[in-house]
Amino acid sequence: GDEVMGIYDRLHQILPGHPEKLFLLAGVNDISHDLTADSIVSMIRMTVERIQRESPDTKLYLQSLLPFDESFRRYKKLTGKTDMVPEINAQLEVLAKDHKITFINLFPLFTERGTNVLRKELTSDGLHLNEEGYKIWVKALKKKM
């Protein structure tokens, strides 16, 4: 995984090629660095605006953050931060609307019903998807293409 500014800093390797489509999903690793939801969304906004400025014909898809499951206790820096994900996602949806880009809300596909927690059968470590999780993700993306 990467952080939002890591992606931003590598855009110079991608944007000169003017990709037809670009799928952006970033932010969960930034949560582990004690950043606020607002600061994470602000960095994603900078990234979106740079993509639109430097490659205006690229169709940009902004994906929601995926949930995680703290009960695995593998990623200590995410402890107590489960509820930040829907807060960030709500702001990302507004960001997408304001910038006239497609927002793909993946979050509800991956959560335990009635919670903000990643379904246990879709992960082996509480953060990263397993094969079953990737199948759900691919299916969701194909619906939007």
Protein language model regions, located:
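A short beta-strand-loop structural module common to alpha/beta enzyme folds
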Residues: 1-3
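Alpha-helical cap/lid subdomain in secreted, periplasmic
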Residues: 8-145
